[in-house]
Regions:
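Short hydrophobic beta-strand element within catalytic cores of glycosyltransferases
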Residues: 306-310
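Membrane-proximal helix-turn-helix segments that form the acceptor-binding/catalytic region
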Residues: 77, 115, 127-164, 172
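A charged, aromatic-enriched C-terminal amphipathic alpha-helix characteristic of glycosyltransferases
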Residues: 67-68, 335, 347-382
Length: 384
């Protein structure tokens, strides 16, 4: 389950205090099904989950294929017609639902990132950074879809009773760069209660000795390969959380062996297990490329784990270097190793944890405030 899904799921109960809610998705995860069942929220889904396109030709048809699935979800049309407000969280296939929403209904789009498969090359690289196919040809094949994406976002922005927010200052700047639009800022959130370790399990991690944690589906964009490379000669192992394609995990295993880095690819973990693994780690690390916000730093703050991250993207919104964690230049290997050594120091860990919690408070990243911010967007749309 990705960070965006975790953020959405943790906010649903708090949104229900502001709105009577229904939830629609093309591919529900078990955690979403569970919370909807527990809280008696209507969950509108297709009979068969929509599969995310992976090759360039399928990506071109992404909008059309997902729209057909949205149209066939039983009860969705009626739910839309009866809505006072619709909040869309961007993701694969989500944008096409806009075509089904009458102009009379206020809509807010939380644009977590511009479509990276269309506007960047990083998603078209193998886990080791090599192109999956000729990048020039890929760019050419996707040119039509790229133009359509820009037009769709601009048309939505000009629609009456519509609003767009990015999830970080970095994302807001990327939206301006790609779509030439000035948009709002809606931070993600954190529920500190999710990171209280209920029961320790020392045998959970299948590694000996100290380790760092890297979260995110194994890929080049998440920096998995580079994280392993960085750990060479540190005597630190890696716990990777997020899974990946078998072919990619096999390549990463071979790479790890060549770097003499032990890696444990964790199975799907419960929230408590995730908290345990993070709590017992040397640090939470990431060399992700252009991460739009990245929930993992604030999750590290919440659990008291040092956050050591690449000095790029949305990580710079939450981490203040040497105050509540470290921001390291991608290729500065010496600084990475020094930071991981710092993360072992008890006093530094305590300081970064304290300052990290202060950062969460300063940005007001509580779920209650997230729901309040969305409610204010709704009020602005109906009164504007």
């Amino acid at each position: 389950m990705g960070g965006a899904e975790r953020d959405l799921i943790r906010n649903i109960p708090f949104l229900s205090e502001k709105f009577s809610i229904k939830i629609a998705t093309l591919d529900p995860v078990e955690e979403l099904k569970s919370i909807c069942e527990k809280m008696n929220f209507e969950l509108l889904t297709p009979e068969k989950s929509w599969n995310v396109p992976k090759d360039p030709i399928s990506i071109i048809l992404d909008n059309d294929s997902s729209l057909n699935i949205w149209k066939n979800i039983e009860g969705l049309g009626e739910a839309i017609e009866n809505s006072d407000f619709i909040h869309i969280v961007s993701g694969d296939g989500s944008m096409s639902i806009i075509n089904l929403i009458p102009n009379s209904i206020p809509v807010h789009l939380h644009l977590l990132e511009p479509h990276r498969g269309l506007h960047e090359e990083v998603l078209h690289l193998k886990v080791n950074g090599q192109p999956k196919r000729n990048l020039g040809l890929t760019k050419l094949l996707l040119s039509r879809a790229r133009k359509r994406d820009i037009l769709q976002i601009k048309n939505f922005s000009s629609r009456k009773k519509s609003s767009i927010s990015g999830n970080s200052k970095f994302t807001v700047s990327r939206i301006k760069e790609i779509y030439n639009l000035e948009v709002g800022l809606l931070w993600p959130s954190i529920d500190l209660a999710d990171f209280i370790v209920e029961e320790e399990d020392s045998s959970l991690v299948e590694l000996n000795g100290p380790y760092v944690v890297n979260i995110g589906r194994a890929s080049w964009v998440k920096g998995t390969w580079e994280t392993i490379s960085m750990l060479e000669n540190t005597n630190l192992s890696l716990v990777h959380i997020g899974g990946g394609e078998k072919e990619d995990l096999d390549l990463l295993n071979k790479h790890a062996k060549s770097c003499k880095v032990d890696v444990w690819f964790a199975p799907r973990l419960t929230q408590n297990e995730l908290a345990i693994v993070m709590k017992n780690s040397r640090a939470s690390v990431s060399l992700a490329h252009g991460e739009p916000f990245g929930l993992t730093p604030i999750e590290a703050f919440a659990i008291g784990t040092p956050a050591v991250y690449v000095n790029e993207g949305g990580f710079t919104d939450t981490i203040i270097d040497k105050e509540n964690g470290r921001l390291i230049e991608r290729h500065d290997l010496h600084s990475w190793h020094l930071a991981l050594k710092e993360a072992e120091d008890v006093d530094i860990r305590a300081k970064w944890s304290e300052k990290g919690l202060e950062r969460i408070e300063k940005l007001n990243l509580s779920c209650e405030m997230h729901a309040e911010r969305i409610f204010k967007i709704y009020q602005q749309l109906i009164n504007g």
